[in-house]
């Protein structure tokens, strides 16, 4: 997918970094906080899924919560949310500044300023004055997200 002009997001669980690529050229790098169980099994532990995904839904802000026993939380006005697999998303995290260390319930946390940059760089585009956008295979595929150890 590293074809000339193709945008894609590379996330390393081990180094806790996110790199934005345009083809084979890196254009932005920042620290992240992925799932607190590191390389554990997603779905059974608080780890981030690994694999190749696409951003399929974006929200300027949203409420995020969990119904998992012993891991309940509710966070309102989470900024710059980009879902890539089920309830897993890249998003801004205003509640901590511990980037570069595992910490989340499985999402990929970014500093709000970094999340904003990624949000406007990645597709699907959110039209002016809209709050959210959804990718459609028929009209526009979301940006590739590659998450690996």
Model-identified regions with their sequence ranges:
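Cell wall/extracellular polymer interaction/catalysis modules
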Residues: 1-50
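Conserved hydrophobic/aromatic pocket- or pore-lining residues that grip, position, or stack substrates
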Residues: 18, 55, 82
């Amino acid at each position: 997918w590293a074809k000339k002009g193709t945008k894609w997001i590379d996330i390393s669980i081990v180094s806790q970094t996110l790199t934005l690529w345009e083809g084979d050229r890196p254009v932005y790098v920042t620290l992240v906080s992925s799932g607190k169980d590191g390389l554990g099994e997603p779905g059974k532990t608080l780890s981030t899924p690994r694999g190749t995904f696409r951003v399929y839904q974006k929200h300027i802000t949203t409420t995020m919560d969990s119904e998992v026993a012993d891991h309940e939380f509710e966070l309102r006005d989470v900024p710059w949310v980009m879902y890539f697999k089920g309830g897993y998303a890249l998003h801004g995290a205003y509640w901590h500044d511990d980037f570069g260390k595992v910490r989340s319930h499985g999402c990929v946390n970014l500093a709000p300023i970094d999340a904003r940059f990624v949000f406007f760089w990645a597709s699907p585009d959110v039209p002016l004055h809209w709050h959210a956008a959804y990718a459609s295979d028929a009209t526009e595929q979301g940006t590739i997200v590659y998450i690996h150890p």
